C-alpha cells in the first residue's frame, strides 16, 4: 500500500529566486535619481549684453517644491528650456563676495541648486548658499562647482554668493541658477506612477501605501547622496491596526541588480515603510501591487478546483507560519499529457509542492518557475502548496493542459 502511494505522489521544493520580472513594471521601477535628471547649465545661455552693476535683491527665486520624481523631472525640463531660472549680471566692488541672488525656500527639505558662473570672462566660479545678508554664514552643503546640495534646510530666505571674493573693482560677474527643495514631509502615499522623493532629516522617514486586496507588494526603496551615489536601504513595513502601527516585516533590503525591488505578501490594508538615511540624503519609494486574492482550500477536503487552462494566484503573508498550506485540485477527464505550471510572484520565493493522484508526474524548470507534467490517468489530482520560508511572497498555479 505504501509503495503504491509513493508512485502516485510528487513532492518537490520550488525556489523562485529569479521571479523579480513578474512584478516589475518597466521604467517606473528603474533606478532614477535627482542627479540623473539634472540638466547642463551655462552662464552664457541667456546673456544678451553687459549691464551695469545689478542689485542682487532684484534677482530673487522661489525654490520649486518637489514631492515626487515626476515633479523634479518637470522642473528639470523647464531648466533645460531656460525657465524657472534666474540670471545675475553685474560688476564687483574691490574685495567683494558678490551676492548674485536670493533664494526663498517655502518648505523644509534638501535644497538643490544647479548653477553656472562666469567671473572676469572665465567660466567656473563657485557659488555658496548662505544665510541672507552674511556671506560668512554658510549653510552645510556639498558643492561640486555645478550644483549645491544642502540638507535639512528650514523654510526661509537665503542668499547665493560667490565663494571667492573678487579682488578688483568692476570685475564682471555673470551667474545663472535654479532652485528646488525636496520635501522632508512624512506620511505621504506612494504607489503606481507616484514615486515619492523624500529628503531625510537623519531621523526615521515614514511613507505610506495601500493594498486594496490580499496580494504581493513589490516595493523599491533606495537612497541618493549629495555625490549622486545610489544605494540600498534596509527598512521595515508596518500595518495600521486601529490607531496603532504594527510591524509585519523587518530587515528588507533590495539590490541594485533588481532595481531594489523587494516583494512582500500582504493582506488588504494601509501600510507604511520605515526607512533611515543620513541627513540630506534623498529616499525614493516605489510600490507596485500585484493582486493575488483567488480562493484556496485550507485542507485536502476543501481543495479549490482549477479548471483546464485556468489559473489561481495566491500569496503567503509575511507574518504567516511556514507550516501554512494551500490546497487545489484538477480533474483529468481522460488519460493524456497533463501540464501544471507553477510560477512565483516575487523574488526569493520558496514553496514546497506536493501532487497526488492516479499517476506520478514529473517536473522540470520553465521560465519563471516549474512545470509538473506527465501522462495522467483519468481522475482527480490534488495540489498542496506549503509556505517554504519567511520570505515567501506569492505564486500562480495553472492547469495549462
Describe the role of every protein-language-model region:
Residues 1-33:
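Gram-positive cell-envelope targeting signals
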Residues 123-135, 230-242, 348-359:
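Short, surface-exposed beta-strand/strand-loop-strand elements in extracellular ectodomains
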Residues 89-90, 100-121, 158-164, 208-229, ...:
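Hydrophobic beta-strand segments within beta-rich accessory/binding domains
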Residues 146-152, 258-264, 369-375:
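Exposed aromatic-hydrophobic patches
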